Each structure stands twice: as structure tokens, then as C-alpha cells.
Amino acid sequence: MPANPFAPNSQAGKVAVVTGASSGIGRATVQQLTATGWNVYALARRAERLAILEAETGAHPVTCDVTDEAAVRAAAKNILAETGGRVNALVNIAGGAIGLDRVADGSPEDYLAMYRVNVLGILNTGRAFIPALRASGEGSILNLTSTAAEGGYEGGAGYNAAKFGARGLTEALRLEEADNNLRVIEIRPGMVHTEEFSLNR
């Protein structure tokens, strides 16, 4: 079995980029990675929360909206300039759900917003960092999806559709990058009590 790329003490000093880092699972991921020796760049929209995270963990704060392709590319350019082009792991945690509307009452705007953050966010960061991850010779991408990517539920069609999309993108990416020694991992958690999920749902 291949070694766990995120195991404690096995990757000290390597560079990770974590999205959705200002709260919830993303914040906890930054805390765990920095505690085990990773050099972490923490991406999120809320600069004030990133500043607190920096003080607590030493992570590098990067204010960025993953749905904004130009902003992601600019952030990646700055990160790669600081690291000498080196990134070993991309951890895509940014995501979210909006509302509980049934399909008959669904808001196209809400559906698009969920698709942008849950699917296009992964696309944007992937396009920005995959060349550096390939160059590392042992890069890893971890995409957080959801058990909502396994089956529909009432009032969740927009979120289901977005997470199914993220799952499909991840599975295709895994096949596409296999020959580049780029590991692509998907984690599908069930319901997690976080501030953001409570606000969105």
C-alpha cells in the first residue's frame, strides 16, 4: 500500500495549499498539517479569519475566492514565486450548500453558485497548481466531496448535483494524472456540524 502522503512526520517541510481554510474542515486541516510539519498556504475569502489562523498555526494567509479564476491564478503565481515553484499537495475543501428548495422551486442562481464553488473551484485550483504538482514527482490532490455525491435527498438537488459533479471531476482527474505520479484522493464525509454548513443549510 502506498505511503500516506499526509502522515505525521513523513512530509515535514513540504508545501500544501488548502482552500476553504478560514473555518470548519478547512481550518482543522490547516491546523493538522502545520502541526505535522507542512508549510501551508491557507486560501479563503475572509482575510480577518486567515489572520487569526496565521497567528495560531504559522500558515501563510492567502485571501482568494476559488470561484474567481483570475484570482486563483494570481494567488498561485505568488505562492509558486515564494516556494520556488514547489507545491506537493493541493487540498480542496472549499464548498457549500444553499437552501433546501425542491426541484420544482429551485433557484437557478443558487444552483449555479453551488456549482461554482463545489466544482469550478476544484477546476480553477487544479489548472493553477497541477503543473507544479506534476513537477514535484509525487504530488497529491485531495478533493472533499460529500455523501451527497452518492445519492439524492429531498430538498438537496442543487447540492447533490454539485457534489456529483465534484465526484465525477475527481474520478476523471485521477485517471488522467495516473501516469504523472500524481495521486488524486476523494473524501466523502457525511454531515459534519460546522458553522458554514449550518449557515448555508
Which residues make up each language-model segment?
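Substrate-binding pocket helix/loop in short-chain dehydrogenase/reductase
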Residues: D101-V103, D110-L112
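Active-site-adjacent segment of SDR/Rossmann-fold oxidoreductases
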Residues: G151, A172-L182
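Conserved glycine-rich cofactor-binding loop
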Residues: S22-S23
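Residue(s) in the substrate-gating loop at a strand-loop-helix junction
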Residues: S146
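The beta1-alpha1 cofactor-binding region of Rossmann-like NAD(H)/NADP(H)-dependent oxidoreductases
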Residues: C64-A75, P108
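Active-site helix of classical SDR
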Residues: G126, A162
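Conserved glycine-rich Rossmann-like NAD(P)H-binding loop of the short-chain dehydrogenase/reductase
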Residues: T36-A51
